[in-house]
Amino acid sequence: MTARSILQEDFDSGVKEATAWALGYIARHNKTLAQAIVDAGAVPLLVLALQEPELCLKQISASALFDISKHNIDLAETVVDAGAIPFLAKALSNPDTKLKRQVLLALSSIAKHSVHLAEPIIEAEIFPDVLVHMAHPDECVVKAAAMLTREICKHTLELAQLIVNIGGIGALVELISTSKLTVRLPAIMAIGYIAGHLDQLAIAVIGSKGIVHLSTILYEENDDHTLAVTVWAIGQIGKHTSEHAKAVAVANILPKLLQLYNNPNSSEDLKAKCNTALKQILQKCMYIEALESLLHDSPPNILKYVLGQFSKILPHDPRARRLFVTSGGLKKVQEIQADPGSTLLEYIQIINCCFPDEIVRYYSPGYPNSLLEAVEQYQPKCPSLFAIEEHLSSDIDSKSSLSSFNEEEKEEHVRKLC
């Protein structure tokens, strides 16, 4: 007897549960085995089993639908075409924790493939109930709810805006700030997707303290995968305008990104994410204090973006030019070795043009040594000591003669009076 006939016939619920469980375990391995389950006509019967009153059968059927739909868009469409979404949505209202988790995972595995498959889930009106589940006592339910939210909002601006309109950002940020590491990863990704779609949505994330909590994760966590996801989300927030970039810079995130990028122990994925995020944010950043903090430790591929921003700021901002000199920025720029014809050299030349030539020379490498060398080579042009002494002697004689003349003049004047 086939699994299909077992699910069709009025067998004991335990037998049906075992059959559905077996179908799911077969399908979960790869898309070929999952396709074989579909070709056998099992999907409509799993949907029927989802409607049975037995709680355990509902759980296993939802799990099997997840195992089938996760592999590719065609398998997910088969599940949707079989009418699974309305019954999965209805099952979400069941108080059983395990069923909630399986339902949310099944819906996530459908939604992730395309906007075409995500829209029917939205139409099933399970939001904002899904957001409510982010505060569920069970961590697995919380994570599954965040995963579904992530898969919905990643596709289009319209879907992301819908999640935002029903309070999605607040729920996600709250989850990030209160939950454990593995639970909050999908929430971090959801925040990144939302912020990446539109500058106004990124501002909403910033206003909800999203950057603050992401910064905390960046400084407290050591897991490279978590750090890579967090760095990616930060890049999505800071990439839009100078206002967004400043929000990231004020949170003291840029030096940490540079530190992670320069760390030889960081994974290649983390380094790549840091490189991309720094590039995205620096190209918009006009916050000079944050830019200066990156001057000393940035490798050339990052430094060119830092100097590129200075080349935009300094020509028009006298205060920034003064600060750039007093903080040691101009001195550091003179020490940079740039290849002829490179973008980096072009930025250095633009920056140097913002200052008087004597200031640029003063901060150039080797300038103090050149001054000392000039002192050593200088030929004094002072008058000789003999000439000075002769001049002093002549001056004394002149004063003495004048004094004698004055005495004689006085005596003559007295005689006349007498």
Region spans (language model):
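Eukaryotic alpha-helical solenoid repeat scaffolds
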Residues: 286-288
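Recurring C-terminal helix/loop segment of individual leucine-rich repeat
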Residues: 32-35, 74-77, 116-119, 158-161, ...
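Eukaryotic intrinsically disordered, low-complexity regulatory tails and linkers enriched
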Residues: 362-418
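Alpha-helical solenoid repeats of the armadillo/HEAT superfamily
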Residues: 11-27, 39, 53-70, 81-82, ...
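Eukaryotic helix-linker segments that join adjacent hydrophobic helices
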Residues: 1-5, 15-17, 21, 44
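Buried hydrophobic core positions in alpha-solenoid tandem helical repeats
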Residues: 2-5, 45-47, 87-89, 107, ...
